[in-house]
Amino acid sequence: MGQFTVVSLGLLAMFLSLSGAKGDNCPASWISRNGVCNKLFPDRKTWLEAEMYCRALKPGCHLASLHRDSDSTVLAWYISDHFKGAGHVWIGLRDTNRKRTWKWSDRTSTNYFSWNQGEPNNVQDDENCVHLWAPSGYLKWNDEPCASLHPFICQYKL
């Protein structure tokens, strides 16, 4: 009887600890990284159309924000492995005030940048949105006119 009680209490404790834990489960077509879910959408949209599409998917969903090299690497592998020839891919960074002050659409901090060499260059004073640059293997960023059409990555926190 004593062993049964110990096992039962152990299972109860495990159940209670797991029931309060946040799972790291993204829907089947999304990838998980560092507590967020990401998905690439191959439809070509403007930056604003892409951001609005992400927001309509789920509360708290936005174009992807990247905050460290490991975030960039995981998404680069994902895009390269599953979407060959996708072209450049929108992320959630843009210069809303046209003053070279870059902000994420999810309002998280902008303490990490992975610009391609010579970027951001704001060609013709019209490059205020950011995409993952395909020739860099999606590891580097480029500023681009927001009206350009690209696939995009949506992201939400678990």
From Swiss-Prot:
Covalent S-S links between cysteines: 26-37, 54-154, 129-146
Xref: SUPFAM superfamilies: C-type lectin-like (SSF56436)
One GO cellular component term: extracellular region
Residue ranges of domain C-type lectin in the record: 33-155
Signal peptide coordinates: 1-23
Tissue: Expressed by the venom gland.
Gene3D superfamilies in UniProt: Mannose-Binding Protein A, subunit A
Locations listed in the record: Secreted
Sequence motif: Mannose-binding, positions: 119-121
Coiled coil: none
UniProt key word Calcium: yes
Binding sites annotated in the UniProt record for Ca(2+): 127, 142-143
Record-stated family: Belongs to the true venom lectin family.
Function: Mannose-binding lectin which recognizes specific carbohydrate structures and agglutinates a variety of animal cells by binding to cell-surface glycoproteins and glycolipids. May be a calcium-dependent lectin.
Listed name of the protein: C-type lectin lectoxin-Enh4
Organism expressing this protein natively: Pseudoferania polylepis (Macleay's water snake)
